[in-house]
Amino acid sequence: KVALVCLYLLFLLIIIAALAPVIANDRPLYAEYKGNTLYPAFADQSRTDSIFTSEGKLDEVLQYDITDWRTLDFNKVIWAPIPYSPESMDRYNRDYVSPNGKQRFKNKEGVITDAPRKFRHLLGTDGIGRDLASGLIHGTRISLMVGLVSMGIASLIGIFLGALAGFFGDNKLKMPRIKYHFTLIGLFFGLFYGFGHRKYALADGFSQGILNGMLEILISTGIIILSVTIFRLISRLIKVNKLQEETFVPIDTFVSRGIELLNSIPRLLLIITITAVVERSIWIVMVIIGITSWTGIARFTRAELLRIRSLEFVQAAQSLGFSSARTIFKHALPNALAPVFVSIAFGIASAILIESGLSFLGIGVPDDIVTWGS
């Protein structure tokens, strides 16, 4: 029953995040104004509507992003339960107005009076007049998005590396010595030119949106693959018998040392250091949290693959001549994800706490984005 309570709470947060523009919005959900039917809350902020008189003459132009909707004389209007947006500032209720304190309101006649009940700030305001209740509602969307996106990135990295480390270990994957060393060289140059040299391009991409940011990451990934491929092709041109001897690739050692290296550095301190030198963007924060949170997932995946690789159905797949990729991703990995999902669930909560801490400190997240921490 306790688990069901947590599940219902999660569903509640998802519903709040999905319906945030309907629950908290400073524009009406529905309005009838001078014979026109408007749905301002569901329209783009840059939209403008022209209001005409019964004779067809232009009477008024409503620009949605700057119109003070509370001062208009509507024939009929339906407001959101919280009639404030998280980024809108109430200049008459600045400096941390209390929920039970005196709150001011500018009515339709332009007179400053006591705020009516439906326009009161239920949880008060912050220093610049932003409604705290609206910030909590819309912050739910940001926090859930941060948790899901960042742990999605961490899951892809952790499950992939953990599966390779657990299945192959240090003595199952072999390749020619020259190809092994040239692969490492290609990987080094690929990481340098793919991510180190393109750090500003990556930051600019995420500042323009998640799609542009993901496109830049795909380009960087392509550079890494191209670099490794080129160096592996070069290795074929070197015909030295000694270098053509096969050697084991210690994937488990590489992954385990990488996990230990990341775990030896305080994660919050590492994230603060990285976010302090890159452009402020919520998407960059998600990526940084994701690429620093994969170690726990990789350890669980590695441990499960170490157990599963010795089971009969995996050995049967190998005996039938199935490729290693098919054996890992189609047979072994699906049976190893149960404990990994537990780690991912805790990781989502941890990512939300990290983002809230960064927002509280004013690091990484832009000032115009309201989150639980800010």
Model regions: which residues?
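Transmembrane alpha-helices
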Residues: 141-155, 280, 306, 325-357
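Hydrophobic residues within alpha-helical transmembrane segments
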Residues: 8-12, 137, 149-156, 258, ...
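Hydrophobic/aromatic residues in alpha-helical transmembrane segments
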Residues: 11, 157-161, 270, 283, ...
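Gly/Trp-centered helix-boundary motif
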Residues: 1-155, 159, 163-242, 329, ...
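Membrane-cytosol interface at the C-terminal ends of specific transmembrane alpha-helices
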Residues: 218-259, 268-330, 342-348
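Loop-to-transmembrane-helix entry motif
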Residues: 1, 136-139, 143-147, 258, ...
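Short coil/turn motifs that cap or connect alpha-helices
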Residues: 160, 164, 323-324, 336
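Glycine-rich helix-loop "coupling/hinge" segments at transmembrane-helix boundaries
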Residues: 263, 274-279, 289-290, 303-305, ...
